[in-house]
């Protein structure tokens, strides 16, 4: 229904032949324009998602940890002004959004820091091995998990593992003497660390999300922060 949108958006649709109650029959010229536009749009969103330049898109200075909501869950530069890069990135990268996924709600809601680059700024390579150290006392009321995604499909990577993740809910996850937890990524698990490992696929890129459920104050005030993901020899 026309009442479900605004005049500017409906005008943009009309300019390419999408009008309520009328058939959509683009000619060959318009089909090429629309195909090119879709490809350019996908490439642009991909570049914004995986190699954004704005420092405001990162949790910490000189870090690869990214904000999932660039411009808040409303994707705004300021009240009423859209953050177009933030929206393009997020809706290429994910689907739904609620305030509880972004706002400070100590002990409730969730947070989703994520990364697509190692400590030196290089993209993750499914044929190489990496390590993430989570310092002691991960600040969550409920649980945490590390999940790996295919950067082509943006869905969970499909491997021999039942789930491409390591979680505080999993049995057998090893903890270091100081209480920290090491999570490994790569085609094969380090010896004895199978329960702390997420399998990746040679020839495929990937990204990961650190999911924090019921995040606590040390997360929000940044007195606790995850280590950078380091390429292993």
Residues of each region from the PLM?
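A compositional/structural signature for long, glycine/proline-rich flexible linkers
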Residues: 1-233
